[in-house]
Structure formats: C-alpha cells, structure tokens
C-alpha cells in the first residue's frame, strides 16, 4: 500500500497541508515541537481511525477551530486507488469513509492499510505496565485477523459486565455471573491462542533484527505469560470468585496477560541501558513489520519512524540505516532534527525520495 497524497485541515498544530508523497521514502526535518510527529499521527489516524497519542478525538482539533479533516489517496497492490476520509465537527461523532462510502463500524477499516509506527513513546513498552504490551499484540493482530477484533470486543464487554456485578453491594445474580464468565472464557481462550501464535512467529524475527542492530552483542528474548497457561480459563476465572468479589473486579483472565521483555535471563526494564532499550523496541517494531508483511495478504505496511536515532551510538544508527534502506521495506516516513541521519539513509537507498521541512505546523518541500 502506498500513500500517494494527503490533505490535512486543523489536525493538532497543522492548520492546512496538501502534500504529494514519495512512493519510497519521505523525510521530515524540523526542530522539536514543530509538527513532525503530528504529521505522522495524521497518517496513523487514517489507518486506525484514531490518534496514536490522544484517546479523545476532540483534543486533536486545532485550538479555536470547529472541525478537523483528513483525506488520503492510496495505491493498493492491484493498482487501484483507495480514498480514505475522516472528518469531525466539535461536539459530533466523526465520519470515516472509504471510497466515499461511510463505515457502519470503524473496526471494518482496521487492516485495510497496515502500518507500523516506531516512536520515542515506545519506551513505555518496557517501562510501563502490562497493558502497554497487550496493546502492542492487539494492534498488530487486529490488522490481519478480524475475528480477533470481535473476540476482543466481546471479551471486554463480558469483563465489564462481570466487574459491574462484582461491585454490587448485594449478592449478584449467579446465573448472570456465570453467563459473563463463560463469555470471558470462550473469547479469552481464542485471544490467547492467537496471541501465542503471533509471539511464536515474532520471536525469531525479532531476535534476528536485534542481533543485526546490536552487532550480536546481547541476547534478548520475549516470553508470553497468560492465565490460560494455568488450565481451562473458565476454571481459572471461577476459582477465585470470592477474592474477585472482595476487591470488586476480575483478578484473572487474558486482560492480565503480559509479554515479558528479557535481556539474557533478566527483565529488560531492570537491566537495559537507554541504548539497549531503544534498540529493543526498534527491533520489536521492525519485526512486527516483517510479520505483517507475511500475514496481510503480502501487503507492505507503511513504516513510520519518528525520531528513532536519539540515544543510539553510531554503530547502531548505521545498522538501522542499512536495515531500512533495503528493498525489504516499502513506503517509509522518517522524522529527525538532524539532517545528517537522513542524508546517510538517502545515500544508502536506491529510488525516489522527498524531503519536507516542518516549522510551526507548516510543511514545505
């Protein structure tokens, strides 16, 4: 999938932009806070129907403006044009359209334009709680497996309903409680199976890329942990119902799953340096790119690289440059404050490129 051009109106600090894009590499240069990340977020929004950074849509509308609008035209693998549009006025719901036809459910759009974003906020994958790492799995799997989206939605609904019953002052209806527990178990076991299959395939890709970037200096591992590994999920959920009732929420289920990040045999969070942590998440995201390429009908995802070279030594920067400069990747968007990094990439790359300069929300060639 190739993003040919994009129109942006009132998206964060970008008041207006109409850009023709390179099918290979697009570089955005500018100081911090100028709008480079906001531009990448606009592209992300057209893939996922939401911002990568703001959960409340009204917060992405430019201050004192009544609406925002995004529109992108893509070349798909069949040589056809895909038009994707999103617009929202303050105080109303957003409208998301594909080829002028509005979606009934936004989840129907997920996976049409596969995309991987690598950004400084990815450090939360290591330093944050398990919900960050579950989200990582959810975002990737949802892009190629619609049944996963449905199971995740059904599981979260059942979890919410069970928790509401657990919070009641009077004894909850046991029939209702068991109904939601069964829904959690059936959908949860499906989520577990798909997450485990994803991790099994991701691990060797991730380890190979990490070794390429680090120069074989460290050994890294991923370890998926789930309550489903303790036995049938329904039994696990019901076993501690008394404790759940005491605390007022569900202590067991796939909403507590985790993906452990290890440097050698020790947690990355405790052992990794800033450079090792950044190498870890970059390798993880690039491995997800390769995984998605194999699973999304062999479609090359868009690759968004936001300020990825900060806190990396020269050897690791050079290794990443060589990686992303290869034919393995399709259309790439890279932001940096340092023109030298981008010049090195362009020297190593064959094919078309475009350089944009970003200042106070204005994007210029």
Residue map of PLM features:
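Structural recognition of the conserved hydrophobic beta-strand(s) that form the central parallel beta-sheet
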Residues: 72, 331-338
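Walker B catalytic acidic pair
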Residues: 306-308
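Post-Walker A helix-loop "phosphate-sensing" segment adjacent to the P-loop in P-loop NTPases
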Residues: 44-56, 287-295
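An accessory alpha-helical subdomain
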Residues: 124-214, 225
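Nucleotide-state sensing region of NTPase/ATPase domains
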Residues: 48-126, 130-132, 138-144, 148, ...
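Conserved lysine of the Walker
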Residues: 36
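Conserved NTPase motor "head" modules and their coupling/switch loops across ABC/AAA+ ATPases, GTPases
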Residues: 1-31, 175-186, 190-302, 311, ...
């Amino acid at each position: 999938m190739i993003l040919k051009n994009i129109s942006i109106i009132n998206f964060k600090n970008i008041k207006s932009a109409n850009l023709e894009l390179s099918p290979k590499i697009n570089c955005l240069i500018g100081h911090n806070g100028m709008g480079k990340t906001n531009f990448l977020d606009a592209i992300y929004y057209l893939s996922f129907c939401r911002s990568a950074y703001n959960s409340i849509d009204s917060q992405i509308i430019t201050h004192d403006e009544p609406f925002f609008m995004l529109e992108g035209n893509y070349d798909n693998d069949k040589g056809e044009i895909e038009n994707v549009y999103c617009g929202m006025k303050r105080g109303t719901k957003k409208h998301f359209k594909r080829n002028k036809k509005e979606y009934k459910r936004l989840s129907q759009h997920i996976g049409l334009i596969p995309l991987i974003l690598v950004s400084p906020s990815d450090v939360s994958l290591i330093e944050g709680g398990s919900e960050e790492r579950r989200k990582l799995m959810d975002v990737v799997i949802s892009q190629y497996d619609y049944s996963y989206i449905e199971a995740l939605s059904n599981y979260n609904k059942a979890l919410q309903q069970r928790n509401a019953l657990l919070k009641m002052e009077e004894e909850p209806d046991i029939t209702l409680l068991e109904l939601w527990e069964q829904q959690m178990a059936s959908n949860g076991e499906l989520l577990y199976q798909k997450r485990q299959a994803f991790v099994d395939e991701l691990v060797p890709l991730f380890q190979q890329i990490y070794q390429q970037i680090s120069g074989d200096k460290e050994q890294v591992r991923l370890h998926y942990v789930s309550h489903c590994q303790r036995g049938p999920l329904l039994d696990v959920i019901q076993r501690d119902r008394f404790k759940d009732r005491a605390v007022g929420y569900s202590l067991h289920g796939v909403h507590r799953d985790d993906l452990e990040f290890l440097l050698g045999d020790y947690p990355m969070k405790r052992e990794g340096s800033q450079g090792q942590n950044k190498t870890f998440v970059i390798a993880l995201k690039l491995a997800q790119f390769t995984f998605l390429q194999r699973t999304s009908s062999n479609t090359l995802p868009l690759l968004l690289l936001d300020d990825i070279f900060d806190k990396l030594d020269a050897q690791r920067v050079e290794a990443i440059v060589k990686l992303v400069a290869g034919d393995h990747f399709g259309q790439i968007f890279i932001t940096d404050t340092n023109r030298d990094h981008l010049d090195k990439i362009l020297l190593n790359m064959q094919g078309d490129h475009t350089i944009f300069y970003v200042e106070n929300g204005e994007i210029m060639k």
